[in-house]
Amino acid sequence: MRAAPSLRRASCLLLAAILDLARGYLTVNIEPLPPVVAGDAVTLKCNFKTDGRMREIVWYRVTDGGTIKQKIFTFDAMFSTNYSHMENYRKREDLVYQSTVRLPEVRISDNGPYECHVGIYDRATREKVVLASGNIFLNVMAPPTSIEVVAADSPAPFSRYQAQNFTLVCIVSGGKPAPMVYFKRDGEPIDAVPLTELPASSSGSVQDSRPFRSLLHRDVDDTKMQKSLSLLDTEYRAGRPYTERPSRSLTQDPNLFVQPTTENIPETVVSREFPRWVHSAEPVYFLRHSRTPGSDGTVEVRALLTWTLNPQIDNEALFSCEVKHPALSMPMQAEVTLVAPKGPKIMMTPSRARVGDTVRILVHGFQNEVFPEPMFTWTRVGSRLLDGSAEFDGKELVLERVPAELNGSMYRCTAQNPLGSTDTHTRLIVFENPNIPRGTEDSRGSASGPTGVRLTLVLALTVILELT
């Protein structure tokens, strides 16, 4: 009687073994893959062991968090046929052998989980199929496609008497995963103070560098401020700030000093006097990163480098933004050189202006490569512009219907960026217009005088006659 339970257990184990033999033996696994680079060929290999007859192999791509399984390849052993479900991919897969699928040119959109399902016949009946599956996550990387370095808050003016902050923005797009971005100055890595990211609502704008103003504020010495204000007052006595020639060395010419608290600064082409309270020591750099996911799975990274600008040492400094990414064999980089504008090239059309013509004066280049983008201000020396304004901001100055009174007038173009300022002058020569008799044009270049009066009287008489 006591042997009965043991006998029953042995019978159950024997029955289970018989059922296992009837179903057949099947194990499935997919060989792991390291991250792959977009554009490379990828082989998904499904290994399985069985002592039964194979029914089919089906490959699935899993999307939407596992809720959707899309067939990408089927092998049907019953009919010994291969069938592709990847019409949209135009049969991008190649069957190497029964359990392997090859993607010759993988894309970022191929990133995600895949499953291999293998079915064998049940030994007891061919109506049943025993299934087993394996899965793998295909991690597709993509190197950055573009890199660009721009200046925030550009264009911006040159400041003589107040130190100002400057921000370089490195924009790296198209990478997956997000790359590592850092800056160098003159080939040497910059040891910057890292800052936490701003909220997503503000981190995407290049213009948003204002939060650094309080971080980089420098205390201004009262004595130096008074001296600077005295210089400013001296310059404005003539009605407009003078410009000054840049020194060829850090030591200024003693002949320029009239007295200890003032300077006599003659007006010249190039203007560049630097804030006296900007220290010559190494600047303190601050670095901030922001990341914006793209709809295609890539990430746009923006690195913002901010410091207190010192035109004396920062002018002609080479800054480079470098990118490291696992999909790149060597760093990717973009370079900019901070340069103050020098020698604007002025073009005037028409080349021979006549009374009544519309004259355009345009800045179409510099003697050097300028960065960041400069801003332009036009003024008329000794008088106001034709429209009555004191100055005009823009690259092109338009004078409509120029009168003869503008002959010989001088125009000043001030081009400036945070590194410096330069003035260029051009004189307008206005020739007589044979279509407009001398003395018949007004200050806007339109016809007036006796001829205009006679024409008005004729029109008035015509109207009176028609009314009577």
From Swiss-Prot:
Q: Which Pfam families match?
A: V-set
Mention any one GO cellular component term assigned to this protein in its UniProt record. external side of plasma membrane
Which compartments is it annotated to reside in?
Answer: Postsynaptic cell membrane
Tissue localization of expression is: Expressed in brain.
Q: Which GO terms describe its biological process?
A: homophilic cell adhesion via plasma membrane adhesion molecules; synapse maturation; trans-synaptic signaling, modulating synaptic transmission
Q: Which residues form the Ig-like domain?
A: 25-132, 344-429
Give membrane topology per the record.
Lipid-anchor; GPI-anchor
Q: Which residues form a coiled coil?
A: none
Segment forming the signal sequence: 1-24
Q: Does the keyword Repeat apply?
A: yes
Q: Which UniProt keywords apply?
A: Cell membrane, Disulfide bond, Glycoprotein, GPI-anchor, Immunoglobulin domain, Lipoprotein, Membrane, Postsynaptic cell membrane, Repeat, Signal, Synapse
**Function of the protein:** Involved in synaptic inhibition in the brain. Selectively regulates inhibitory presynaptic differentiation through interacting with presynaptic NRXN2.
| Domain statement | Ig-like 1 domain is indispensable for synaptogenic activity whereas Ig-like 2 domain is secondarily responsible for the activity.
Q: What is this protein called?
A: Immunoglobulin superfamily member 21
